[in-house]
């Protein structure tokens, strides 16, 4: 008889790699030999911030970089849990949540009370429910109701749970860097990672949410919708433990799991529905539809989490899948991409940021077209805030994708790995790509802007009949209208038992809650056609800048050795007629401004369109009255209309907010304009000017024998641009925030 030795379990961690040292952490710049020496000039503090998280500059070991990123992720999660915990704590301690639950259409959500130090209590408005506070627009009240939270105690407990999770995350971050640090092969085991993330995070995550919705949220929301007082609703565990209690609300519970195992699944159609449309009581998606959706998603992801080959020799191999992708025109196709994505975290991050950013923008649009939570659709300030928020997040992620793709090109790109594959072929015909994209941008910009200029001119000359408008020369968005019609009619054939189309934005009825419009068909016309082409123009220009930055990150005709200069450098000397703003970093810098341009027009379009054509009230006899009375179609077709009827007309609330509970927005509007203007000082002025000024100030200090030990230095060119764009965006975003909220809280 022969004995086979058992296969040893693979150890994928190293023990006690980095000692835990508070002395080391207390030393600023401990990660860099030059920074650890301490400051000689004021540039030191800038370099400290620039390099603290640039792990590539700390070490050349990919394993060590991977461990630092992994550990930092736990730190990030800890911060998120603390932040969430604070949100829930405010809901428990400083809010009118329970009052709002009993009258969500009449009471405004508030979870913040301003302390009266020097008269700030003016900001505490009468929001209803016996509460004086600031109206919040985060949508958390609606989310809590959908979760089945009915009292402050549940919010307190969840807040404590968040702090507990934060502590766990901080511990995990320390443990997996100092005590048991994963080896590089663990980080590069993509099949195992895919299986765990798909089946664990997305599959079991969706399944547990579906379970919570079915066993806790559905019964509680059904009782709330029926008008039962929050204080009389049974506690969540009673619904879970007492089947009879559930069966009163959802009869299929009486049958237990028998229908599941006998495949008689239609018995569960009272908890897992396919109604479509919105609930007429809450104006949100049917929660039974949402539970069904999460159950289906869970099944899909649990299957997906078993698709990739690990220890059992069955399933997909990512490397094989990628290398099989060879088209007739793509040479070696995706060969080499596996090596890129397992050795360059910048390349990996670039793809993930592009995906996540696009997803955030998709979420922004679904939140109003298919509002997921009860009473969200009629809370106009929250709807506007959620749209704006998800658009900004998406824009920043997509620009970040351009940034990290360019860093990959500069730091991690290998010409031997990328021979004649899709990336190499993109780089080899980059001139054709960029010049064509540039032509598209000029075409879109000239024509879309030209339509507006034409209309402004005709209106100024009093020739309304010669304008592009719904009442003169029509430019109807026929393709969009066709898609709307298909989506309105199709469910009648594809989902015969559904009550309504997926979104009322396409067509069908007007949904009202109380007398407020939750959602209704969004009619598209000439004004939408015109502004959509401005969207196309700004998106293409942003793409042009970012893509040019990536494709020319390593070299160009102007600077053949660009890769040697690094990711960020101000210029390559004064020759060749000037070489400024050619670094990959500068393309990201310029791309941020166009991202801001693009998104400003998107959120302005959304804000005005919804106020003009969707949001408003319905009288008892069915007459619809919109906030701005449908003025979008005739006003948004000229530049003057945008300036006069949107920006100026709707700024009256923020400009006249002084002395009211909205006065903070008036001050923010003013202050944010100042921050924005302050940015121009950094963007329109050269470094030499400031260095000269500093030297004359230092001379005066020397005369008085009060010269500092740390020599002052002007910001470098790149630092100045970074400070400039940061204040430009911060000022612009905060100005928009104040403008939007003062307006919509006053009229919405």
From Swiss-Prot:
GO molecular function: 4 iron, 4 sulfur cluster binding; chlorophyll binding; electron transfer activity; magnesium ion binding; oxidoreductase activity
EC class (word): oxidoreductase
Keywords: 4Fe-4S, Chlorophyll, Chloroplast, Chromophore, Electron transport, Iron, Iron-sulfur, Magnesium, Membrane, Metal-binding, Oxidoreductase, Photosynthesis, Photosystem I, Plastid, Thylakoid, Transmembrane, Transmembrane helix, Transport
UniProt-listed Pfam families: PsaA_PsaB
Binding positions ([4Fe-4S] cluster): 571, 580
Residues given in the record as phylloquinone binding sites: 690
Annotated cofactor note: P700 is a chlorophyll a/chlorophyll a' dimer, A0 is one or more chlorophyll a, A1 is one or both phylloquinones and FX is a shared 4Fe-4S iron-sulfur center.
Residues binding chlorophyll a: 681, 689
TM region positions: 69-92, 155-178, 194-218, 290-308, 345-368, 384-410, 432-454, 529-547, 587-608, 662-684, 722-742
Localization in the cell: Plastid, Chloroplast thylakoid membrane
UniProt topology in membrane: Multi-pass membrane protein
Reaction(s) the record says it catalyses: reduced [plastocyanin] + hnu + oxidized [2Fe-2S]-[ferredoxin] = oxidized [plastocyanin] + reduced [2Fe-2S]-[ferredoxin]
Cellular component, GO annotation: chloroplast thylakoid membrane; photosystem I
Keyword Chloroplast in annotation: yes
EC number, UniProt record: 1.97.1.12
Ligand binding (chlorophyll a'): 673
Gene3D superfamilies xref list: Photosystem I PsaA/PsaB
Entry superkingdom: Eukaryota
Keyword Plastid found: yes
Biological processes, Gene Ontology terms: photosynthesis
Subunit structure: The PsaA/B heterodimer binds the P700 chlorophyll special pair and subsequent electron acceptors. PSI consists of a core antenna complex that captures photons, and an electron transfer chain that converts photonic excitation into a charge separation. The eukaryotic PSI reaction center is composed of at least 11 subunits.
Family: Belongs to the PsaA/PsaB family.
The protein's role, per its UniProt record: PsaA and PsaB bind P700, the primary electron donor of photosystem I (PSI), as well as the electron acceptors A0, A1 and FX. PSI is a plastocyanin/cytochrome c6-ferredoxin oxidoreductase, converting photonic excitation into a charge separation, which transfers an electron from the donor P700 chlorophyll pair to the spectroscopically characterized acceptors A0, A1, FX, FA and FB in turn. Oxidized P700 is reduced on the lumenal side of the thylakoid membrane by plastocyanin or cytochrome c6.
The protein, known as: Photosystem I P700 chlorophyll a apoprotein A1
Species the sequence originates in: Cyanidioschyzon merolae (strain NIES-3377 / 10D)
Annotated gene: psaA
């Amino acid at each position: 008889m022969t004995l086979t030795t058992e296969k040893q379990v693979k150890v994928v961690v190293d023990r006690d790699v980095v000692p835990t040292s508070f002395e080391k952490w207390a030393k600023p710049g401990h990660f860099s030999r030059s920074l650890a020496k301490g400051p000689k000039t004021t540039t030191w503090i800038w370099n400290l911030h620039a390099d603290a998280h640039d792990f590539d500059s700390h070490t050349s070991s990919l394993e060590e970089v991977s461990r630092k990123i992994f550990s930092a992720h736990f730190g990030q999660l800890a911060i998120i849990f603390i932040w969430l915990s604070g949100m829930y704590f405010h809901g428990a301690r400083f809010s009118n949540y329970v009052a709002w639950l009993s009258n969500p259409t009449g009471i405004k959500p508030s979870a913040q009370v301003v302390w009266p130090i020097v008269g700030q209590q003016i900001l505490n408005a009468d929001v209803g429910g016996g509460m004086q506070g600031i109206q919040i627009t985060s949508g958390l009240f609606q989310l809590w109701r959908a979760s089945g939270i009915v009292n402050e105690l549940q919010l307190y407990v969840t807040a404590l749970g968040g702090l507990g999770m934060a502590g766990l995350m901080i511990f995990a971050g320390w443990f997996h860097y100092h005590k048991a640090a994963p080896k590089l092969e663990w980080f590069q085991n993509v099949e195992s990672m895919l299986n765990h993330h798909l089946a664990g995070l997305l599959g079991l995550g969706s399944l547990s949410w579906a379970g919570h919705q079915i066993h806790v949220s559905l019964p509680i929301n059904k009782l709330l919708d029926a008008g039962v007082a929050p204080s009389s609703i049974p506690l969540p565990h009673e619904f879970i433990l007492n089947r009879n209690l559930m069966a009163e609300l959802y009869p299929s519970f009486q049958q237990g799991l028998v229908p599941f195992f006998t495949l008689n699944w239609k018995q569960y159609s009272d908890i897992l529905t396919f109604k479509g449309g919105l609930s007429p009581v809450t104006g949100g998606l049917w929660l039974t539809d949402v539970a069904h959706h999460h159950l289906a998603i869970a099944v899909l992801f649990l299957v997906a989490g078993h698709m990739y080959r690990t220890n059992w020799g069955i399933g997909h191999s990512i490397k094989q899948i990628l290398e099989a992708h060879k088209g007739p025109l793509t040479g070696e196709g995706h060969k080499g991409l596996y090596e890129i994505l397992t050795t360059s975290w910048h390349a990996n991050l670039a793809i993930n940021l592009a995906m996540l950013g696009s997803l955030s923008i998709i979420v922004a649009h679904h939140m109003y077209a298919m509002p997921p939570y009860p009473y969200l659709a009629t809370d106009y300030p929250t709807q506007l805030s959620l749209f704006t928020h998800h658009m900004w997040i998406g824009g920043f992620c997509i620009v970040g994708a351009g940034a990290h793709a360019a860093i990959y090109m500069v730091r991690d790109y290998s010409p031997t790995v990328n021979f004649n594959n899709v990336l190499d072929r993109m780089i080899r015909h980059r001139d054709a790509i960029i010049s064509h994209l540039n032509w598209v941008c000029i075409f879109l910009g000239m024509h879309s802007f030209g339509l507006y200029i034409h209309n402004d001119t005709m209106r100024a000359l009093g020739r309304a009949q010669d304008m592009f408008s719904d009442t003169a020369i029509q430019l109807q968005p026929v393709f969009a209208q066709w898609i709307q019609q298909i989506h309105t009619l199709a469910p009648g054939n594809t989902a015969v038992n559904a009550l309504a189309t997926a979104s009322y934005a396409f067509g069908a009825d007007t949904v009202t809650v109380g007398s407020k419009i939750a959602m209704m068909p969004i009619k598209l016309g000439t004004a939408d056609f015109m502004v959509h082409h401005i969207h196309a123009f700004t998106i293409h220009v942003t793409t042009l800048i970012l893509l040019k930055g990536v494709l020319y990150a390593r070299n160009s005709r102007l600077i053949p050795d660009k890769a040697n200069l690094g990711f960020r450098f101000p210029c390559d000397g004064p020759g060749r007629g000037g070489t400024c703003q050619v670094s990959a970093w500068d393309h990201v810098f310029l791309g941020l401004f166009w991202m801001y341009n693009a998104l400003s027009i998107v959120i302005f379009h959304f804000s005005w369109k919804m106020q003009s054509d969707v949001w408003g009230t319905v009288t008892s006899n069915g007459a619809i009255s919109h906030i701005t009375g449908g003025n979008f179609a005739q006003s948004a077709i000229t530049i003057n209309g945008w300036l006069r009827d949107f920006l100026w007309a709707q700024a009256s609330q923020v400009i006249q907010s002084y002395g009211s509970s909205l006065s903070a927005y008036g001050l923010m509007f003013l202050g944010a304009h100042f921050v924005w203007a302050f940015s121009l000082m950094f963007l329109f002025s050269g470094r030499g000017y400031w260095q000269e000024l500093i030297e004359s100030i230092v001379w005066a200090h020397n005369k008085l024998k009060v010269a500092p030990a740390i020599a002052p230095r002007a910001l470098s060119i790149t630092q100045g641009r970074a400070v400039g764009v940061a204040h430009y965006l911060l000022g612009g975003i905060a100005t928009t925030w104040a403008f939007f909220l003062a307006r919509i809280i006053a009229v919405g």
